[in-house]
Amino acid sequence: MTKPNGSGDSKNTLYCSFCGKSQHEVKKLIAGPTVFICDECVELCMDIIREENKTSAIKSRDGVPTPQEICDVLDDYVIGQRYAKRILSVAVHNHYKRLSHAGKTDGVELSKSNILLVGPTGCGKTLLAQTLARILDVPFTMADATTLTEAGYVGEDVENIVLKLLQSADYNVERAQRGIVYIDEIDKISRKSDNPSITRDVSGEGVQQALLKIMEGTVAAVPPQGGRKHPQQEFLQVDTTNILFICGGAFAGLEKIIAARGENASIGFGATIKSGEERGVGDTLREVEPEDLQKFGLIPEFIGRLPVLATLEDLDEKALIQILTQPKNALLKQYQRLFDMESVQLTFTPEALVAVARRAITRKTGARGLRSIMESILLDTMFELPNLRGVEEVVINAEVVDGNAEPLYVHASKSQTEAG
């Protein structure tokens, strides 16, 4: 768009159709069929869209997402685990309600209920937390318990968790104080010995002790630049009273402690193994009691800070097939998209999907092992495919998954190839 008035130079000058600035006043001018838009207007549009996305987060009539709404979104990405989803949905819903109730002076103070997720590896604990992060309108951060140590030792301080939450809230202290923290691999900070006085356990019991206060509620002094490297910086004061903590861990071996308690067996090899085979890890974990967690290595005070306990189930063959095919970000859909980019259709037969699920069960890696299995099956095909001509479909059957056959390449007919 040019403006007709002015000197000869101005006739050739282009202007933004929205704000009217010339090409010399802005960094870039993007041309459409009959209009132009400058980089500043594009940025403004993006800001407007971002704000609209924030305000369009799931809300019920009183501004609090209902447990059903939260659970429905979790269902889009996480297969199974109905019991754990319901517990998480109610806990997050109540967290929102506590925040909206905070200013009311009716004498009733609502305390938070932190959550402990217990389940076998690859059953969806971390994915549940990541999916929650997508749908919540409060700051959310994930931390790895294995990197934490007591203050004064090499490693991360527990205050770094609050710092990460503060960063996810763009250093808005008030928003960070209403956030949710997920601490993964919490079972890795169990006490290393039944006798706490033998030696100082800086990455086990020491971390549990350090987490107690921030989980219950304290004013944490958080260094904005990350702590030990900048000792002279000013500290930000963050009140953790209203921060919801969700902890998750596989707790490998906990099922044996539960089984031994249930059968009153101090040694009894056969009985415990038989119980495990008949019921599976997930079924056994459902009977977990605080005393079992204490025997595993969590201190009683730490267990007391996690009043809500949710156990996750083992993923069976049917659930693993659903994980491969059904969610919005299903693994099979991802690989099919990669093959689409080469104009090739990728097809897994129903028998092949069953074989993939069985391999994952044999490996005992749960859903986490599915990607490595798929990668090993399709590696050679993905290597060769860009150099092949006329291939329109690749078919994977059970024999291919088991390593007894090569993938089937379906070529376009001669007439189609010539037409192409």
Swiss-Prot record:
Record keywords? ATP-binding, Chaperone, Metal-binding, Nucleotide-binding, Zinc
GO-annotated molecular function: ATP binding; ATP hydrolysis activity; ATP-dependent protein folding chaperone; protein dimerization activity; unfolded protein binding; zinc ion binding
Q: Which InterPro entries match?
A: AAA+_ATPase, ATP-dep_Clp_protease_ClpX, ATPase_AAA_core, Clp_ATPase_C, Clp_protease_ATP-bd_su_ClpX, ClpX_bact, P-loop_NTPase, Znf_CppX_C4
One GO-annotated biological process of the protein: proteolysis involved in protein catabolic process
Q: Which Pfam families match?
A: AAA_2, ClpB_D2-small, zf-C4_ClpX
Q: Which GO terms describe its cellular component?
A: HslUV protease complex
All residue ranges annotated as the ClpX-type ZB domain in the record: 4-57
Query: Does the record's keyword annotation contain ATP-binding?
Result: yes
- Summarize where ATP binds, as residue positions: 120-127
Indicate which residues the UniProt annotation says bind Zn(2+): 16, 19, 38, 41
Instruction: Summarize the protein's role.
Output: ATP-dependent specificity component of the Clp protease. It directs the protease to specific substrates. Can perform chaperone functions in the absence of ClpP.
Give the record's family classification. Answer: Belongs to the ClpX chaperone family.
Q: How does it assemble?
A: Component of the ClpX-ClpP complex. Forms a hexameric ring that, in the presence of ATP, binds to fourteen ClpP subunits assembled into a disk-like structure with a central cavity, resembling the structure of eukaryotic proteasomes.
Protein name according to UniProt = ATP-dependent Clp protease ATP-binding subunit ClpX
- What is the species of this protein? Hyphomonas neptunium (strain ATCC 15444)
